[in-house]
């Protein structure tokens, strides 16, 4: 704002003389009038520029008076091109000045320009230099960041200058500190000398000290990148220096991503010895980043892990890799590569896309030797079947076409060898599903060609090229009270083998089969009231009949087919097998009934109970190799229940019951109690007769609840206040073997500005071996983490359903939340 347009009453009698300070008790008459006018304009909220609206001289063009414009929102960030046009507001107990030269404000002085506010006992502002000098109780609020001190010199628009004996507090993370001097470089950068930095909030006790604090020779603050860089710094915890850094290190000022070293991890492993890893994060672009993690293992050598991620409007993915030269454990180089890619492009004649999921490792023992790797690279690699799966697809309206290649790497164990699945080199699939057909009919056609390849010495059967086609037509009859859907399917399959079948001596086989099904159901509704609550109760009986004639398929090898799991999702289907190598001969009727309790306000399901059973009218002769034909007329009974009576409680159960033996074959019972944030208990019982019987319990719960301390609700991802202990864990116990299979148990302590975690993890890796780790971490909130072993947060998230991190990333607060 230009102060040259002060109104005439504020002009001194002799313009060449500076304005003199006078006693406020006896101001001259012209100053009384001027201050009265100035006070009136200040009360009305007008900038000093408005004081210049005097009559224009002869020939001059009158400038329009400034006016306020309505806006639907406050601007979080002021545009750069608008800053030079921003007016300056000043007020205080005593204001004097010279036009085009300066202004002086004494007593409760305040200067405002855009998102910058300066308070002081005395403030001098020089117009030509845009320079503000302030003394006594000086306070700057710059976009929510607050600086306080004794002496300030600042170029207001450029925001460059210095502040002596200063303290500061940042809006984004609540961090604050003290400094001998603050040099403001520009609006986003500052250099703080002999500085401290912490996020521990002060209390009223005179003996209070921050739990952790950084002391540094200097700290460079970059609010644009939200990064702090400390030179000659040391991290103190509970008054003890724990991490001196003679050089420089960076730390975040918010949750924004930044390039730099991530917290290191130190661990001890019985196989690898002492393990030290130091991740480096590279923020390449807003939609691309990379993490490189060198790792030193005292018993094995040095390895490097890397991860690259990318995100575009039409595609995304990640590339991971590990490399360890001359691993002393196996006396060879070890490596792993992984790629995941997903993408779809609009071509104008449909969308074309590519999906890739590929993983490869150097040797069969990789899954065993690197099963606990979590810092970069291939994470949690414990599976022994690794895919290299790529699918190129196209789709438009009712039609789709895809080309897929799938090749497996099987990691064999000499003590437990497995038969690898078949590669698909390639698989071509075409599908057509018209959105509407005349007469209310529905229909679809699909065709598939797959070349199955594998090592015949391991599979014991020939490879094959399989061509498959299926057409289906249905006519749904729908009404509010029920539905009837007849459906007719035609299956045609042709096999070409690379060698003669042992059973027939032929190199080809074919199969053509029809399938008919009739699905029907009714829906009855009534108002009901249970336990003081109103519900809409439904009763939904369902009958499903299917018929497929018998065709001998015993000579056809199995390439991609398996028996479906027996549950409520598969009991109402035409074929009991997934894949296309077996189509079961069926003449059966499935009967079931479900009742639901629905909330009449929002339609939410409070409870669900169901039962279903199959009635077989003839034996099922088509089976998988090693299976016996099915001759029982009545199948096992499926009984299921799900209860979500409130948002806090949940219960789900499915039981497969054999009425002939009066015993359950398989049971799954689960319950959840989640009364509020950071309080959850999950329990499950799983039973499969003759195979396994396990109890699984997982939890996260504040221990302070035991003595009546319920904590505070600080919002999502903010914890429940300081001084709180949390118990976390998961126990998987085998009743059949009478031992714990998997164990994760630990504690978390939240002290507001730091969080401590200690977790014991024991995971079964085979029948006879298990991996045990002790994980320890201190998180300095808003600064960094120090870990011993792998990151316990990832372990807790992977093992405890509904586990909540005590400090989730949250959007930065608005600058108007700290507005003066």
UniProtKB/Swiss-Prot annotation:
Region described as Disordered: 1-27
Protein name: LPS-assembly protein LptD
GO cellular component, one term: cell outer membrane
Family: Belongs to the LptD family.
Quaternary data: Component of the lipopolysaccharide transport and assembly complex. Interacts with LptE and LptA.
Pfam families hit by this protein: LptD
GO biological process, one term: lipopolysaccharide transport
Listed InterPro entries: LipoPS_assembly_LptD, LptD, LptD_C
Bias (Basic residues): 13-22
Source organism (scientific name): Paracidovorax citrulli (strain AAC00-1) (Acidovorax citrulli)
Role summary: Together with LptE, is involved in the assembly of lipopolysaccharide (LPS) at the surface of the outer membrane.
